[in-house]
């Protein structure tokens, strides 16, 4: 099964001011991401407020991304839902569209507390799209599924034929690396924390990853990997430190989903508000964040259109 090389973006979902999904910006969005070195998108995930979209909206978004995606631009669809039947519908739909792959995080409800429960959940979704690579999206801060991922790989091995790997959005570089080394790298371990790309590269990983701050800082994050490959360690270190500075700023403004989406507006690409219950930034907060970003010369280094 093909492994992903390079960084995949987790895009925001564009909304009109009234909260309806806005499909219009997606073509320009895809072109911008590719221009800045991103290799594809992982849509309808946490950055895209996927759990706050209807099934029909998620399908429309998938259709639009597929329709306008540049050549060789990978489309991976997050199909996770609290309703397994809806997840299977989304997986079947994604396969019919001919996307590159699908993925799912554990549901926020009901809480999954055992590996066998998680395996069964993944198995039923993956079987609805047997022709597509399936990635488990490990982000326990969102759903409480603090389960050992090496045990998951051992449990799915030989049981879920199209299980491709894990989008690993957690703090344990030790566990990430142990999963990466399992059976000489059998599974694709996609690094999911933009703040630690460089240390992951030092372990031999991060050949592929999925990020959220790649929406606006993708050029610099791609540059970390390029500098590492070229042996330019100091450049890679500087770019990683800059990425952490950007992340420190958005952490002052409710993180990537809220603060990051507003950065897109400051860059001239307004993707609209967040859906309730997210608390949108005020105009005063926006101006304060802009000043913090200007202080680190963000707008001279951010993604270009």
Task: Describe each region flagged by the PLM.
Residues 2-145, 303:
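Active-site beta->alpha loop and helix N-cap motifs at the rims of alpha/beta catalytic domains
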Residues 3, 8-12, 36, 205, ...:
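C-terminal alpha-helical cap/extension of soluble enzyme domains
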Residues 27, 59, 63, 88, ...:
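Generic alpha-helical structural signal
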Residues 29, 90, 196-197, 260, ...:
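Residues within well-ordered alpha-helices
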Residues 36, 60, 64-69, 93-97, ...:
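Alpha-helical structural signal in soluble globular domains
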Residues 49-50, 110-111, 172, 198, ...:
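Short secondary-structure capping/turn micro-motifs that flank functional sites
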Residues 126-132, 140-244, 250-251:
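Catalytic alpha/beta core domains of metabolic enzymes, predominantly
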